[in-house]
């Protein structure tokens, strides 16, 4: 488990870009954090490191966006999904078992259908340390829940 501290969006992006160097085809990144914690900013940092040139936006209404770069990035937003079962989300397997990287915001909402071995990234705000302060915990062991 690795813990990072960020004091602004630029630092969050740099942390994500460094983290992206550890990803490989088939990696699944499960993001958790409150609204406005920086999940999309973290995703944008990963995408940038993987050669994506277009702007990354949260796919709240489409559920998944695809970005092509040196490696394909599938960016999910599971905010609107609740009480999912494997049958509800069997379409996700096409992404989870692809040659791209899956990054899932609000992953706890679909935790029941995530394949084993995903990487958990938790982003926490702490206003006592500043409005833009973030604690970013990356657990690559798969032991921490999203």
Regions found by a protein language model. Name each.
Residues 1-18:
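N-terminal pre-Walker A segment at the start of P-loop NTPase domains
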Residues 2, 85, 93-146:
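Short phosphate-coordinating micro-motif centered on Lys-Gly-acidic
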Residues 19-26:
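Phosphate-binding P-loop
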Residues 29-31:
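Hydrophobic anchor at the beta1->P-loop junction of P-loop NTPases
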Residues 35:
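The conserved Walker
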Residues 39:
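Conserved lysine of the Walker
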Residues 52-67:
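Short beta-strand-centered segment that lines the nucleotide-binding/catalytic pocket of NTP-utilizing
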Residues 75-82:
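Switch II (G3) loop of P-loop NTPases
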